């Protein structure tokens, strides 16, 4: 029993930061957090665009993709045929056409001085969708996770 406690403590220390990286601010719905992280109708330089996201989480996010489209258009993808997500769930949907997007990758810095590379892309995307929460827009399904870029 004594040997188990240090091992448990080590696991908690190692897994704690991983869990924090995937959490979203609890005062936001998952759809609203998706919109903040991934919807940017007009292209912005990544250092500027990422500062808003990093201010919520208080750390430098390693990678992020901004879709240059409206939330309404991205939410419409949720009405397309369901496909299997990376996590094996069946709530993902692929865009029917490519969209302009910006890929931001952390190159240096420590919060709040995060520095990113900026790469313009024109690709398809896959989003995970869930039923809306009370304060979400009134769609049948809303995007909650950017699962992949194709």
Curated annotation (Swiss-Prot):
Role noted for this protein: Ribonuclease which shows a preference for the pyrimidines uridine and cytosine. Has potent antibacterial activity against a range of Gram-positive and Gram-negative bacteria, including P.aeruginosa, A.baumanii, M.luteus, S.aureus, E.faecalis, E.faecium, S.saprophyticus and E.coli. Causes loss of bacterial membrane integrity, and also promotes agglutination of Gram-negative bacteria. Probably contributes to urinary tract sterility. Bactericidal activity is independent of RNase activity.
Family: Belongs to the pancreatic ribonuclease family.
Native organism: Papio hamadryas
Protein name as it appears in the record: Ribonuclease K6
Chain's gene name: RNASE6
An annotated Gene Ontology molecular function: RNA nuclease activity
Positions annotated with a glycan in the UniProt record: 55, 100
Residues with site note (Facilitates cleavage of polynucleotide substrates): 59
The keyword Secreted is annotated on this UniProt entry: yes
Active site: 38 (proton acceptor), 145 (proton donor)
Binding site for substrate: 61-65, 86, 105
Domain of life: Eukaryota
Quaternary assembly: Interacts (via N-terminus) with bacterial lipopolysaccharide (LPS).
A biological process term (GO) from this entry: defense response to Gram-negative bacterium
């Amino acid at each position: 029993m004594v040997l188990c406690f240090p091992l448990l403590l080590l696991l908690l220390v190692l897994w704690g930061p991983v869990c924090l990286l995937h959490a979203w601010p609890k005062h936001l719905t998952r759809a609203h957090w998706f919109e903040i992280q991934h919807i940017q109708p007009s292209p912005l330089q990544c250092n500027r665009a990422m500062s808003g996201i990093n201010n919520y989480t208080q750390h430098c996010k390693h990678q992020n993709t901004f879709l240059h489209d409206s939330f309404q258009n991205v939410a419409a993808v949720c009405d397309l045929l369901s496909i299997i997500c990376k996590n094996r769930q069946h709530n993902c949907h692929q865009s029917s056409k490519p969209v302009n997007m910006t890929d931001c990758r952390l190159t240096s810095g420590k919060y709040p001085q995060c520095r990113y590379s900026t790469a313009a892309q024109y690709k398809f995307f896959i989003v995970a969708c869930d039923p809306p929460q009370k304060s979400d827009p009134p769609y049948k399904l809303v995007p909650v996770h950017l699962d992949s870029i194709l």
